[in-house]
Amino acid sequence: KCNPKGFTNEGCRGIDKKHWNSQCRTSQSYVRALTMDSRKKIG
């Protein structure tokens, strides 16, 4: 199953295991950056 966000609650799943970690870390970092930015704007 594919996840639009590129990661799931259980972990990150990519097409290839070699890119699995890199895609996971990039996605999480990107989401965290947006979350922090949103909190700063709202708060």
Curated annotation (Swiss-Prot):
Alphabetical list of InterPro entries matching this protein: Cystine-knot_cytokine (IPR029034), Nerve_growth_factor-like (IPR020408), Nerve_growth_factor-rel (IPR002072), Nerve_growth_factor_CS (IPR019846)
One record GO biological process: nerve development
SMART domains tied to this protein: NGF
Xref: SUPFAM superfamilies: Cystine-knot cytokines (SSF57501)
Cell location: Secreted
Pfam families xrefs: NGF (PF00243)
GO molecular function: growth factor activity; nerve growth factor receptor binding
PANTHER family reported in the protein's UniProt record: BRAIN-DERIVED NEUROTROPHIC FACTOR, NERVE GROWTH FACTOR NGF -RELATED
Function statement: Promotes the survival of neuronal populations that are all located either in the central nervous system or directly connected to it.
Descriptive protein name: Neurotrophic factor BDNF
Lineage, highest ranks first: Eukaryota, Metazoa, Chordata, Craniata, Vertebrata
Gene for this chain: bdnf
